[in-house]
């Protein structure tokens, strides 16, 4: 075997082989050839012989550690975990933000483990103790990825979508694929010893401005109290889920100019009704008007509301793919795009949507009614995208947060994690205490 070479700096390089570099294998030699550092083609390297094994640098927890060039990682184990976490939101329970009222928030996790023992976490969009979705993932999705190379993120995503597209392009199956995609990105970051935002191109900020996404209270008193609590906690952006005009006006008045207000009404009206209500609210200077018309895929109808010119229109949390956003933007339906990482194909799909939005001058503000890995992935993606001004956080309090204090906003802002991968691990207490035996 050819001995290690030295380049002009005198540093020893690893053994080389032809082919493109893959990120992820901690057994791969660290130091890339000098042309890789200067922007040239990066060559993958094979592990050195035993005599040189002591020179391998393994990933460290710090964000500034050296990148490890990855050869391959095999998915050895995969399982789902369903949690039901009680929460409080003020007022009279149960609470809603447009759907069925509830006292607890369900989180469907996927846990992937490689043959090297690395663990990656993902999250599927889930509501109402979704045992059916868990079983779908356990029986249809996870068996298809066992033994696959975890560094082949796009390839795995495409193969799953192609094999299972008859189940629908916006469905529980797609939510499960999104969860797997998030977990694969977590694995990649951990294998490289790098935070996810760095793999996405670097962060524009180390913390994000958060908007408090309030529950739908349905009465003025509870809503005004919740609005004031959000202001007291330092939030300067507040989203309402109310559909009553009296409630909306009362909350805007309670803000007294201290916070910008947007409303998310969850598609309750016909297009003519949405046009009329948009006109009723035109004096409130709303930050945006979200999903005013039914059905959510009626992009031409949504475009009519936008063409009225009274409010900026936001939508996208019910879209399933890049092509849905292409149709939305082509119809002139939105000012703000809101894909959900746990619904719309994971990080891989949202990266494409972000580029599409940037090319068309549409704001990219991901939807995030999530408290698991989907929430953390959205933090990283938002930090890495220049045109994302704010980050969504549902305004409620848990007995135990899945990530402890790390994802609780302070004075209306949230820190971007700096550890490898997602940078955070679920708190064992939460996994044990709130896990459903299904």
Residues covered by each model-derived region:
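Metal- or metallocofactor-binding catalytic centers and their adjacent structured scaffolds
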Residues: 113-191
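N-terminal basic, low-complexity leaders that serve as flexible interaction/assembly modules and, when applicable
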Residues: 72-143, 431-438
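N-terminal small/glycine-rich loop or linker at the start of catalytic domains
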Residues: 167, 192-216, 251, 256-258
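Active-site mouth loops of central-metabolism enzymes
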Residues: 208-221, 265-270, 314
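Flexible C-terminal active-site loop/helix
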Residues: 74-90, 101-105, 353, 369-438
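Catalytic core of soluble alpha/beta enzymes
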Residues: 240, 245-373
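Conserved, mostly hydrophobic/aromatic
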Residues: 75, 117, 141, 180, ...
């Amino acid at each position: 075997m050819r001995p290690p070479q030295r380049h002009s700096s005198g540093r020893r390089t690893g053994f080389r082989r032809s082919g493109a570099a893959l990120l992820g294998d901690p057994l791969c030699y660290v130091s890339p050839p000098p042309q890789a550092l200067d922007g040239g083609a990066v060559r993958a390297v094979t592990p050195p012989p035993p005599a040189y094994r002591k020179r391998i640098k393994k990933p460290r927890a710090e964000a500034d550690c050296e990148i490890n060039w990855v050869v391959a990682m095999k998915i050895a184990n995969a399982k789902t975990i369903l949690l039901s976490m009680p929460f409080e939101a003020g007022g009279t329970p149960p609470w809603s933000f447009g759907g069925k009222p509830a006292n607890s928030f369900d989180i469907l996790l996927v846990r992937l483990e490689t043959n090297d023992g690395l663990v990656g976490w993902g999250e599927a969009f889930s509501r109402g103790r979704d045992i059916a979705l868990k079983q779908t993932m356990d029986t249809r999705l996870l068996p298809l990825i066992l033994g696959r190379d975890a560094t082949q993120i796009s390839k795995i995503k495409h193969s799953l979508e192609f094999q299972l597209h008859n189940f629908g392009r916006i469905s529980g199956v797609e939510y499960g694929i999104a969860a797997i995609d998030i977990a694969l990105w977590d694995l990649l970051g951990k294998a490289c010893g790098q935070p996810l935002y760095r793999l996405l191109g670097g962060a524009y900020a180390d913390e994000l401005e958060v908007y408090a996404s309030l529950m739908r209270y349905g009465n003025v008193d509870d809503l005004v109290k919740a609005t004031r609590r959000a202001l007291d906690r330092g939030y300067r952006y507040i989203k309402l889920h109310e559909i009553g005009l009296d409630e909306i006006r009362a909350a805007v008045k309670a803000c007294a100019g201290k916070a910008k207000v947007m409303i998310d009404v969850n598609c309750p009206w016909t297009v003519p009704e949405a046009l009329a209500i948009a006109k009723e609210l035109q004096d409130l200077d709303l930050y945006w008007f979200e999903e005013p018309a039914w059905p959510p895929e009626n992009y031409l109808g949504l475009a009519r509301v936008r063409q009225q010119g009274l409010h900026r229109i936001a939508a996208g949390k019910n879209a399933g793919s890049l092509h849905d956003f292409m149709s939305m933007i082509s119809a002139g339906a939105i000012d703000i795009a809101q894909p959900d990482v746990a619904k719309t194909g994971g990080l891989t799909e949202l990266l494409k949507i972000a580029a599409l939005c940037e090319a068309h001058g549409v704001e990219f503000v991901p939807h995030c009614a999530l408290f698991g890995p989907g929430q953390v992935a959205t933090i990283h993606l938002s930090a890495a995208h220049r045109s994302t001004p704010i980050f969504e956080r549902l305004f409620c309090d848990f007995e135990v947060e899945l990530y402890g204090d790390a994802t609780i906003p302070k004075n209306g802002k949230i820190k971007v994690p700096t550890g490898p991968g997602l940078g955070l691990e679920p708190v064992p207490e939460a996994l044990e205490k709130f896990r459903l035996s299904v």
